[in-house]
Amino acid sequence: MSIKGIIAGLGNPGGQYEKTRHNIGFMVINKLITITSASKLSGKKFYCELWKTTTIIDNYLLAKPQTYMNLSGEAIHPLVEWYNITKDNLLVIHDELDLPIGKMKLQQGGGTAGHNGLKSIIHNLGTKDFYRLRIGIGRSPLPSENTVNWVLGHLSMKELTTLNNLFPTIFDALSFFIKDEKETAIRMINSFTLSETVNLS
């Protein structure tokens, strides 16, 4: 099986974390699994759930680390090592507090903005130069709300609807990303604007 790259969505395993803001990475992978009719592989030795598709993303694995968010690197690192994946062909999808819901950013490298999943991956890989798809969750409209409570809080129906409207653009951009047309993918994601902004207050 020839594997060129990995698309990993970050989140926390367990039903209690489904549809929480911190699990947006998992949600994107779940959508890709459905769209591409991906088949599940054994990822136990990597502490990951893994899928392979024979459609448009046929040379990339879809991965969901099962280590909990703050230890994501302990799953990503052995997976990258086993398949000999370069930093240019690793894409990590995660939630982003510093972007409003409905906005996305695709970039290579950069900081962590305090995201513990990214910190763990950078620590374990020894590089920050992999690609990230940052999906905005915004910050709580309540100044007194703890950040941890916010990211572990469940998405509202309005937020879920907004996220669903992102998926067509994400899928189209990924179709360019895997063909090494990464600048095209970056332009598609970074220029995307919803017709209606979402007010969480």
From Swiss-Prot:
The active site is at 22 (proton acceptor). The record marks 95 as: Stabilizes the basic form of H active site to accept a proton. It catalyses: an N-acyl-L-alpha-aminoacyl-tRNA + H2O = an N-acyl-L-amino acid + a tRNA + H(+). Its EC number is 3.1.1.29. TRNA binds at residues 17, 68, 70, 116. It is an enzyme of class 3 (hydrolase). Its main location: cytoplasm. It comes from Lawsonia intracellularis (strain PHE/MN1-00). Hydrolyzes ribosome-free peptidyl-tRNAs (with 1 or more amino acids incorporated), which drop off the ribosome during protein synthesis, or as a result of ribosome stalling. One of its GO terms (molecular function) is tRNA binding. It comes from the Bacteria. One of its GO terms (cellular component) is cytoplasm. HAMAP family: Pept_tRNA_hydro_bact. This is Peptidyl-tRNA hydrolase. The keyword tRNA-binding applies. Keywords: Cytoplasm, Hydrolase, RNA-binding, tRNA-binding. Monomer. The record marks 12 as: Discriminates between blocked and unblocked aminoacyl-tRNA. One of its GO terms (biological process) is protein quality control for misfolded or incompletely synthesized proteins. It is found in: Cytoplasm. Belongs to the PTH family.
